[in-house]
């Protein structure tokens, strides 16, 4: 099915990046030269705070989503030019503030006061 998006003599174009924390850092375009390749995006979120994004071309892309104790992994595949543009926000502001509150408490009052 992925090959249907390709016309003879053309290649699929996908955004490409490795382990970026912002979708804005994933603007490099990769030329997928093998017939049947798809664009993919992987988002790995650790404890709701930090999201790492990777993108590129793949012959064996499979949509996948897994929840782990410390985070979540999500892989999406698509087969049209630059279809893997969307990413995830690198840091959720409210979650970051909530996560930093205990550390701030330790700095201000010390470990014995918490």
UniProtKB/Swiss-Prot annotation:
Topology of the protein relative to the lipid bilayer: Lipid-anchor; GPI-anchor
Upregulating conditions: Down-regulated in gastric cancer cells.
Tissues and organs where the protein is expressed, per its UniProt entry: Highly expressed in prostate (basal, secretory and neuroendocrine epithelium cells). Also found in bladder (transitional epithelium), placenta (trophoblasts), stomach (neuroendocrine cells), colon (neuroendocrine cells) and kidney (collecting ducts). Overexpressed in prostate cancers and expression is correlated with tumor stage, grade and androgen-independence. Highly expressed in prostate cancer bone metastases. Expressed in gastric epithelial cells, mainly in the isthmus (at protein level). Not detected in normal intestinal epithelium (at protein level).
InterPro entries (UniProt xref): Ly-6/neurotoxin-like_GPI-ap, LY6_UPA_recep-like, Snake_toxin-like_sf, Toxin/TOLIP
Compartment(s) of residence: Cell membrane
Disulfide bridge map: 14-39, 17-26, 32-57, 61-77, 78-83
Record's subunit section: Interacts with CHRNA4.
Name this polypeptide is given: Prostate stem cell antigen
Protein species of origin: Homo sapiens (Human)
